[in-house]
Amino acid sequence: RKPAAPARPVLVHGDYRTGNYLADESGVTAILDWEGAHLGDPVEDLGWVCVKSWRFGAVDKPAGGFGSRQELWTAYERAGGGRVDPARAHWWEVFGTVRWGVICHQQAWRHLSGSVRSMELASIGRRAVETEVDLLQLLKETA
């Protein structure tokens, strides 16, 4: 069930994941691709960065392949973001997984329909099945 609207909507990036960070030896220097920014739930970006597709093989580190969910939430809270409700964060991770699965199907269709012939789109499209498995695992955790 979708959580209630947040008491205080905040600026949400909308695509907060490792592919949209710039970093150097000092750490993250910029966050890119703000076209999906909107006012919303403070936990939405935290759920999106935990979608399994952004771990790039580091499945034991669900927070973008860098750490645990708890480490992410603790850092968020220490930075002034407020307390993270784990159930709310889980809902947004499930939502993000569904969202990514839909995007994978859309990218595959763009390639297969001939509207945009692209190996990149074809390879993203094949990830739809992985996302379906990820979703089943997340839903099992919820049950």
Task: Please state what every model-predicted region is.
Residues 1-2, 67-71, 128:
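Active-site catalytic-loop/activation-segment of kinase and kinase-like phosphoryl-transfer enzymes
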Residues 15, 33:
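Conserved catalytic-loop position in the HRD/HxD motif
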Residues 1-14, 24-26, 78-84:
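An alpha-helical support segment within catalytic cores of ATP-dependent transferases
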Residues 113, 118-143:
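Regulatory N- and C-terminal appendages and interdomain linkers associated
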Residues 43-81, 95-113:
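Active-site activation/catalytic loop segments of kinase-like enzymes and analogous catalytic loops
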Residues 83-95:
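All-alpha amphipathic helical-bundle segments outside canonical DNA-binding/catalytic cores
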